[in-house]
Amino acid sequence: MFSPSPQTLSILVAVFILATLLIRRALLPKPIPGIVYREANAKKILGNAWELLQWKKKHGEMFGYLANLAVELNEPVFQIFVHPLGKPWVIVADNREAFDILSRRTPKEFDRSRFLRSLFMPLVPEFHFHMPTGERWKAHRKLVADTMSPAFLGGVAGPQMWKSTMKLIDLWRVKERLAKGRPFSVSTDIRKAAFEIIWAATFGFDSGSTNAQTELLETLPEFTNLGDMDHEVHFPVAPDPPVFKAGLALNDAMNIGVQSLVPGLHLWLAYNLMPSLRAARSLKEAVIQDEIKKAINKFSNQTDLNWEDQGNLKRHMKSAVDIVIAREIDSARKEGRTPELMSRTVQDELFSFMLAGNEIFTLTAWTLKFLTTHQNVQKKVRDELREQCSAAVERGDAPTVSEIMSARLPYFEAMIEESTRCGSVTQTNIRTTMQEVNILGHMVPKHTEILMLNNGPGSFMPPLTVDEEKRSESSKGTAGKIGQWNVKGMRDFDPERWLVKDEEGRLTFNPNAGPRHSFGAGPRACFGRKWAALEVKIMMALIVWHFNLEPTPKPLSSFKPFPGVAHRPEMIYLRLSNV
């Protein structure tokens, strides 16, 4: 039996200790020279990751940690360490420089984030959103470009949004009657309505989710023993159609990646190994393929499409599937090639509309909470709507899509923008450096993730001091073009901060009153922002038109966010009364 000598044992122990120290050193963060960081985090293998997770556990989101760290370090550009062996992330806490990066320095110096790519690739590998800027991205975006045209939004998507929202109104009328003035949660209702609206506009038919819930509640007798007026009312839930349920499940799975240190791998394993998600993906693909086939049959022999004639398009186009398939057939005919109609590209681009439901649901949820809390704002919004849609008032009916879209509603627009701001719908914009870049005098290496805060200094905290000489030339040229918020009241919900008077003395919505990057900016801004803006406008206009959003009890009025893909409120309760 081998028995090492004391000298050998000493050598082995020394080698083990040395190896341990070398491994630990290799795992420690490697700061980018010249960029500020918290020194204590650079001495930990997990860097800032543990503190980020603890902040998220306590507050429901993690970007507040970065905003506070910016103030602590007193630096508009600093770095954090989130992945062992990974590169540091660079944080930009200056709105003007962030806007310059998004709008003028993308895509030459900055491009779509690799982190975001890892979130979307496992489910929709051919979705243009996560692709680097280039010919492939342009081709994919061109395929769906018509879905954001005024003709499609006003003539096809808008009416579908209106119809679906009215079904939500019908559901809430039943709930309001059964609740008898008591509060109830609308989180699930809003989420399903947001997705159902997108579903109807994308595929041209109703999923039936909201109708099923309304029909179930209409069969119930009047509720008894409801408790006091502040007691929450619970309602039974109708089962969702299988394909609608599948779409929601696939969307929810994105949260797996958001909360993972290796999002791409974690999501790939989930989509491919979890039986429920595998079944959901198969059902989703089968339904999309079936709808594509219907559109192919509809347009294969259609030769009179005039893309400049809006009336012509309205006659033929009933959904996003229609317009995407018709465009591909028409383009292929002109280019002398075979159309790629059943491709993964077409399927992923169509399903991507469903992924946008997170942001729409989130913005609608925050808006409802702010209007419930700020009764004076709610009254101003309703009064403006009724004044500008006076024909609907005279008819005793809801305003039509065209009336809502054409109405001059500066206060309404300001309220939506302020809800977007105060709800921090998108707390950060992320880009990847495409070359070594200079950000406020700091040299940042190629392929570094850049996080630009929407919730920090200059937005909800006093701006940090920046040496103007260190700004990029394009940033210097924008001085004074976008306003800055008064430090006093930065955190307050105040739609009037977005309003100015025009030459005729009329109140006008000023989009440049202050920083607004929630949907990004520049060539890689959110592709679906026009769709989202219209959907939220129609939903909120019809909700406020039909209901008073009465104050809710304090225990049901928390503004704490829910951790996930989008920064949404954890609870959404309404106490409704008919207008």
Model-assigned labels for residue ranges:
Residues 280-363, 501-504:
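Conserved cytochrome P450 catalytic core segment spanning the I/J/K helices
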Residues 308-311, 372-425, 440, 445-448:
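Cytochrome P450 I-helix active-site segment
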Residues 375-378, 521-525, 529-567:
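Cytochrome P450 heme-binding "Cys pocket" and the immediately downstream C-terminal segment
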Residues 37-61, 67, 116-202, 220-297, ...:
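Cytochrome P450 catalytic-domain helical core, especially the substrate-recognition surface
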Residues 452-506:
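Conserved cytochrome P450 K-helix/beta-meander segment immediately N-terminal to the heme-binding cysteine loop
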Residues 194, 198, 288, 330-384, ...:
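Central I-helix of cytochrome P450 enzymes
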Residues 2-125, 135, 139, 162-167, ...:
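N-terminal membrane-proximal hinge/A-helix region immediately C-terminal to the signal-anchor transmembrane segment
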